[in-house]
Structures are given as C-alpha cells and as structure tokens.
Amino acid sequence: MPAILDVHGREVLDSRGNPTVEAEVYLEDGSVGRAIVPSGASTGSREALELRDNDPKRYKGKGVLQAVKNINEIIAQELIGLEALNQYTVDKTMLELDGTENKSRLGANAILAVSLATARAAAASLGVPLYVYLGGVQARELPTPLMNVINGGKHADNPLDFQEYMIVPLASTFKESLRWAVEVFHTLRSILKSKGLNTNVGDEGGFAPYLEKNEDPLAILVEAIQKAGFEPGKDVALALDLAASEFYEDGKYILKAEGKELTSDEMISLLEYLCDKYPIVSIEDGLSEKDWDGWKKLTDKLGKRVQLVGDDIFVTNPQILAEGIEKGIANAILVKVNQIGSLTETLDTIRIAHQAGYRTVISHRSGETEDTFIADLAVAVNSGQIKTGSLSRTDRIAKYNQLLRIEEDLGEAALYRGILNFKR
C-alpha cells in the first residue's frame, strides 16, 4: 500500500473571499490528493474549532496561517510513512496529536483538509473515483437536492427570520431533477423582478428579496413551481431551514418579521400550520439547539409527517447524535464535514444515523469552495439527500456538475429515489 511521502498546507480563499485551508497529500507512488475546507455563517455552539489567526492586520483577523503552519510543521511529520489507504489510522493520529475535544490545538480546518486530501490521494493511487473508494460497490444512489433559492436570517439583509427556503425536485433521475430545479429558479427570478424585488444572489446563490413575513417566500415558491409548469408537492416540493438557534433568546423565539415572541409550543404550532398549507417535506433546525424538550415535542408532533433535520443540535457529532436518538429527537441529521473535523468521524456519524433509521443530508457551508468532495461523499454513503446551494455561483454548481458526472459514470446502476427519501 502506498505510504504518505509529504503533506503540504496553504492559505487560499473561500467563496466569500475569506481565507481557508487547502492541503495536499503526496504518496510514494506519485499520487496526489488535494482538499479545501469550507466555513459556515450560522454555526452550532458545539462545532469543532475552526482555527483563525485573529491578527487584525491580515484579512481582518480571519487568516489561517497558524492552521497552515500546524499542517506543515506538526501534522506532516507525524503522517509521513503512514499508509494512505488506512484512513482511520491517519485520522486517529491527527486527533491524538491535537488532544482536545474540539480540535482547538491544531484546528479542525487543518485536520479536515489533510483528512479529505488523504482520501483523495488514496483513491488516485487505486485509480478509482472518490465515491467508489469511499463507498465501494454499493455506492450508487444519487442524492435528491434541497436547493436554497430564497435566503433570510444570517444569509440575507432582509426582515426574514428563517434562513433558507428550498425547492426539492422529484424527477426520476438526478439529471432531470436538476433541469426542473433550474427552470423553477429562473421562473422565480422573473416573478421577483415582476414584483419589483431584488434579484441579486447571496452567499449560497439564492435570492434575498425584501419580503416582510416569514411565510411570504413559501407562497412565491409555490407560484414559481406552478408557472414553471410543475405541480407543487408532486413534481417539486419545499423544504425549510429555520436556523432557529439564531433567533432564540431567553427561552423564546423572537420573530422580528412578525413582531412576535413565541414559546416552543407556539413555534411547533406555527410549523404545523405551514406544513398543512404548503408542500413541505423537510424542516431543518425548526427549534433551537438549546431547546431539547421542545425538539422532543416537535418530533412527537410532526416526525411522522415530515423530515425533521438536526443541524446545530447535532453538529455532525456521533456522541451528540447518539444522545438525540436515545431521546427521540429529530428523524434526520445534517452532515457537515467541518462541524466534526475529520472524515472518519463523519462516516461514524452517518453510520450511527443510518443504523437508527435516521436519514442523512450531506451539506455544504455558506462559505464554500470549488472542492466537490461532498458530492462524492453523498453517493458513497447512499445518503439520498444533499444541500449544496442554489442554481448560481460556481462554488455551488461545481457540486451539481460532479453529481452529473457520477450519474453518467454509474450508468444503469444509478439510483434516484426522489420523493421516496422523504416518505415517513
């Protein structure tokens, strides 16, 4: 098996123009793997630590030279000579080297970049696609995309409290679903223009129009689906990411758009009302990461009707997820590789979720890059769902294009389950 010959890190930029970490892993047989890590805007309080320099003279404190230095001067020395195909040993070595619960010594961004680059180098050495290396012969399911086309919350400068309003295309193949979504996206742009609303796009490629009520985007999306020639709920469904932790204060949910302060029970009633009125198949972070009792009530109330995705509450952490499963909280988990900070731990989380009957949604971050690792990962683990932004911005489209390539590569073996991924 090929051993690691060298590891190199560098500071590059993400889609928001902020520094991030890129790593390259070189093997003795000449194979090379490269990976760039993303960065989030709304983050869970228990995420692994993204190491920043905090030097106000460089990139307003957001530089990552220390993380890069940790790769080049600490991590590299420990990994040289290890077998690249033994991902567990590579990751375990870095985790032990860091020695902290949240990867604060070396930085989750440093560890993850090397972890993902190692997997790429191993796949290159074997001469197989990344999704095949990660998932083997069973890696054949293309994910249904949840596409963030209207932004609110921390992703936009508008009154909306909810962070993401998504369309979910339900065709018979990924390629056809992507086409349907693009047609709805461009129809949505025309509708927003006709209403005199802003059609500039945000971090994730979605629109951020000035809408006054949290329900308004749902009505506009239904209109866009219909005008594009599709049936809401049957051809194209809807999904929400409230990022509710961002507007949770002192035990109340502060909805500034409506001028209301809601209890957990009232928030649950609001979500139930929206599910009754609109073809919503998935709700992410419907309640705060601190509101575990509320999450249990939400799951009991809506868990048999819609997918309830835990993001901030689980932060892709296998131990926290196991606790949530035991308490009957949510029925799906959002998987972000940089929340936990290594490929091995990410795969552990996915395994625990699937064994418990929880669905997994592989996800990007708002600060993305041209790296397409998560597209391969979604197919490798047969996740069945992916969140990687809207239908604009190359950093988002890159993942969709990679999925098109994978679907073509799989040929007749490719599976696309569409609405079946959301059936309770």
Curated annotation (Swiss-Prot):
Pfam families hit by this protein: Enolase_C (PF00113), Enolase_N (PF03952)
Free-text comment on the cofactor: Binds a second Mg(2+) ion via substrate during catalysis.
Active-site positions on this chain: 204 (proton donor), 336 (proton acceptor)
Record's keyword annotation contains Cell cycle: no
Protein name per its UniProtKB record: Enolase
UniProt pathway: Carbohydrate degradation; glycolysis; pyruvate from D-glyceraldehyde 3-phosphate: step 4/5
Similarity field: Belongs to the enolase family.
Matching InterPro entries: Enolase, Enolase-like_C_sf, Enolase-like_N, Enolase_C, Enolase_CS, Enolase_N
GO MF annotations, alphabetized: magnesium ion binding; phosphopyruvate hydratase activity
Keyword Transport: no
Main location: cytoplasm
Localization per Swiss-Prot or TrEMBL: Cytoplasm; Secreted; Cell surface
SMART domains: Enolase_C (SM01192), Enolase_N (SM01193)
Residues involved in Mg(2+) binding: 241, 284, 311
Domain of life: Bacteria
Catalysis performed (reactions): (2R)-2-phosphoglycerate = phosphoenolpyruvate + H2O
CC cofactor: Mg(2+)
Name of the top EC class for this enzyme: lyase
